[in-house]
């Protein structure tokens, strides 16, 4: 239902307009306060890069963060990552992730990023505290990438990158809750790069696609072509589950059942195993896998995806960030 409201297909969005005006007024006032320096943002001693969204829902932001961190690491840059840790609840903040940190403590995305990149990752509702925690334990870090947080103006930033779903884009264009917008589309004029996941990019936008890898067994780490798996049940607890199901079909998989889950939904063995019958194979997103690995069964697999950016702009962006980081 919410997708139909935000896309404009359902007329119910008009009933939510008063709340949207209030949201827009408050969020605009907050940004203006920082712009006029009525409120002061905390500036880190190293460059900060924000990777965020203008809309609610899944846009492919986390794969972009992983891509960015890995690309900078390949250039010899020491990167730290901070996040709010949405969906997790730690005993205290800031929380610096370790090999033992669970998604229940830190949230799905931070654990995924930590496991994929090996970069120092810290979470806190106050992102500046997360930055301080990383720099205290890893003083050699040269640049901070913040996963989400475009609207978290308490943390000053040097570069802003926005990720857009190229198919859904901005829906009906209204602020939450009548539409999907956290900020209006005009905000794009002030950011440094716009990355478009799928669809048809517009002038000045960087095209991106999510490239699926081989399926990975949660228990053994064995890899295989996902099309070799039979009697597949697909689950996806991400911001936009249909994207994952479409990716599976693009890979030649015709799932017997597709089960969309809520983003950041807590998972346990009983609930997940109940989705699969005897003889069926479970295939999930990598984000779900970080929550299920501890209790996975032999027939549970996940399909990792990597961000693939096209054109000349990604190289220019990386050169800019490398230059920024090299000065610290």
UniProtKB/Swiss-Prot annotation:
SUPFAM superfamilies: P-loop containing nucleoside triphosphate hydrolases
GO cellular component annotations of the record: plasma membrane
Keyword terms: ATP-binding, Kinase, Lipid A biosynthesis, Lipid biosynthesis, Lipid metabolism, Nucleotide-binding, Transferase
Pathway(s) where this gene product acts: Glycolipid biosynthesis; lipid IV(A) biosynthesis; lipid IV(A) from (3R)-3-hydroxytetradecanoyl-[acyl-carrier-protein] and UDP-N-acetyl-alpha-D-glucosamine: step 6/6
Molecular function (Gene Ontology), one example: tetraacyldisaccharide 4'-kinase activity
Keyword hit for DNA repair: no
Catalyzed reaction equations: a lipid A disaccharide + ATP = a lipid IVA + ADP + H(+)
Keyword Protein biosynthesis attributed: no
Top-level taxon of the source organism: Bacteria
The family this protein is said to belong to: Belongs to the LpxK family.
PANTHER family linked to this entry: TETRAACYLDISACCHARIDE 4'-KINASE, TETRAACYLDISACCHARIDE 4'-KINASE, MITOCHONDRIAL-RELATED
Function: Transfers the gamma-phosphate of ATP to the 4'-position of a tetraacyldisaccharide 1-phosphate intermediate (termed DS-1-P) to form tetraacyldisaccharide 1,4'-bis-phosphate (lipid IVA).
Name the UniProt record assigns to this protein: Tetraacyldisaccharide 4'-kinase
């Amino acid at each position: 239902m919410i997708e139909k409201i935000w896309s404009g297909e359902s007329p119910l969005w008009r009933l939510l307009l008063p709340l949207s005006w209030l949201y827009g007024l408050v969020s605009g006032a907050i940004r203006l306060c920082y712009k006029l320096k009525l409120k002061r943002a905390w500036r880190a001693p190293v460059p900060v890069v924000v990777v965020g969204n203008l809309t609610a829902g899944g846009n492919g932001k986390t794969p972009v963060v992983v891509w960015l961190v890995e690309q900078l690491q390949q250039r010899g840059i020491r990167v730290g990552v901070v996040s709010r840790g949405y969906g997790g609840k730690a005993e205290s903040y800031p929380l610096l992730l370790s090999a033992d940190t669970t998604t229940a403590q830190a949230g799905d995305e931070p654990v995924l990023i930590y496991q994929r990149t090996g970069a120092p990752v810290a979470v806190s509702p106050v992102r500046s505290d997360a930055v301080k925690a990383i720099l205290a334990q890893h003083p050699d870090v040269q640049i901070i990438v913040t996963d989400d947080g475009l609207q978290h103006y308490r943390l000053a930033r040097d570069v802003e990158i926005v990720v857009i779903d190229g198919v859904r884009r901005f829906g009906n264009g209204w602020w939450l809750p009548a539409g999907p917008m956290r900020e209006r589309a005009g905000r794009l004029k002030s950011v440094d790069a716009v990355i478009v996941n799928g669809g048809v990019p517009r002038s000045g936008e960087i095209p991106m696609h999510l490239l699926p890898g081989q399926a990975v067994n949660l228990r053994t780490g064995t890899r295989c072509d996902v099309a070799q798996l039979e009697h597949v049940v697909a689950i996806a607890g991400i911001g936009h589950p249909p994207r994952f199901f479409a990716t599976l079909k693009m890979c030649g998989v015709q799932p017997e059942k597709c089960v969309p889950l809520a983003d950041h939904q807590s998972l346990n063995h009983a609930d997940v195993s109940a989705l699969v019958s005897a003889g069926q194979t479970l295939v999930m997103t990598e984000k779900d896998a970080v929550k299920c690995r501890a209790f996975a069964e032999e027939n549970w697999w996940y399909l990792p995806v990597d961000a693939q950016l096209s054109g000349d702009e990604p190289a220019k962006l990386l050169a800019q960030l490398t230059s920024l980081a090299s000065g610290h």
